[in-house]
Structures are given as C-alpha cells and as structure tokens.
Swiss-Prot record:
<dbReference type="Pfam" id="PF01230">
    <property type="entry name" value="HIT"/>
</dbReference>
<dbReference type="InterPro" id="IPR001310">
    <property type="entry name" value="Histidine_triad_HIT"/>
</dbReference>
<dbReference type="InterPro" id="IPR011146">
    <property type="entry name" value="HIT-like"/>
</dbReference>
<dbReference type="InterPro" id="IPR036265">
    <property type="entry name" value="HIT-like_sf"/>
</dbReference>
<protein>
    <recommendedName>
        <fullName>Uncharacterized 16.1 kDa HIT-like protein</fullName>
    </recommendedName>
</protein>
<feature type="domain" description="HIT">
    <location>
        <begin position="13"/>
        <end position="120"/>
    </location>
</feature>
<feature type="short sequence motif" description="Histidine triad motif">
    <location>
        <begin position="105"/>
        <end position="109"/>
    </location>
</feature>
<dbReference type="GO" id="GO:0009117">
    <property type="term" value="P:nucleotide metabolic process"/>
</dbReference>
<dbReference type="InterPro" id="IPR019808">
    <property type="entry name" value="Histidine_triad_CS"/>
</dbReference>
<dbReference type="GO" id="GO:0003824">
    <property type="term" value="F:catalytic activity"/>
</dbReference>
<dbReference type="InterPro" id="IPR039384">
    <property type="entry name" value="HINT"/>
</dbReference>
C-alpha cells in the first residue's frame, strides 16, 4: 500500500484548511490552489487564495502553485464582481512580518472595495532612503 505524503506543514492553519481539518468557507478551488473567505474580513467578500502545497511566502512558492493561485484569484475576482458588485478590487500579498504577513503560508488577498470604503492605503512619508537612481543601479547591475 502506498501512503499519501502530506504536502502540509503540521502547524500551519492554512494547511489545515486545505486538508479539511480546519473549518473554512470555501468559495473556489483548482488542482493546486484553494480559495476561502477571510475569517477577519476588511470588506464583504474578502477572499484568500492559497496554494495547496505549503510555501512560507511568495518568493518560496513554486511556479506551478503561483500560476494556480493567480488563475484562481482571477476566477474569484470575476465571481466577486458579478455577485457583490464592488466598485473595485485590491490584490494584496504581504511577505514577511515587517510587511504585514501574519500567516506564514503564501496567500493572496482579493479584497472588494465599495463606494464607502477606503482603497489600499499606506502611510506616505518622506524617508532618507536611497535615490531612485541608486536603487535602479543596484537592481540592474550584473551580479558576480
């Protein structure tokens, strides 16, 4: 008998959702991704789309899972637009605690925006960061 190998991290709540061990309100699924309503929504219809295979963040997620998440997010966006008729949508991915990631299983937020709500906001302030030219040079120079 062949034993099915789990792709889950035993301590991950999102892996528990994928495996059916944690209750969720599933709204969509494909072969490699799963979509469910956020337990702490910032708007009606706030949906999370996750890969079924555990990955800590966007950068560590395999390409097949990234594609599946993106396609399912698009499907969820169309469903949200059709059924809830928001004025717009935000697609949000946070990577790392400093960026606001709270569950360390890659996930994309699909957040409907309504006439009375705020768009995706962040604090804009002057910083002492490098110039745009310095960042461009760092990102485009050849690496040894």
């Amino acid at each position: 008998m062949v034993q099915k190998q789990s792709m889950a991290n035993n301590n991950c709540i999102f892996c528990g959702i994928v495996e059916g061990n944690v209750k969720s309100f599933k709204v969509g699924e494909n072969e490699h991704a799963f979509a469910f309503l956020d337990a702490f929504p910032v708007a009606d219809g706030h949906t999370l789309v996750i890969p079924k295979k555990h990955a800590v963040n966007y950068s560590s997620t395999d390409d097949e899972s990234l594609k599946a998440v993106s396609l399912l997010a698009k499907e969820m966006a169309l469903k949200l637009q059709q059924r809830l008729q928001p004025a717009g949508l935000n697609y949000v991915v946070n990577e790392g605690a400093k960026a606001g990631q709270e569950v360390f299983h890659y996930h994309m937020h699909v957040v409907p925006k309504y006439e009375t709500g705020l768009g995706f906001c962040y604090n804009v302030r002057k910083t002492n960061n490098r110039s745009i030219e310095a960042n461009w040079e760092l990102l485009t120079k050849e690496v040894d």
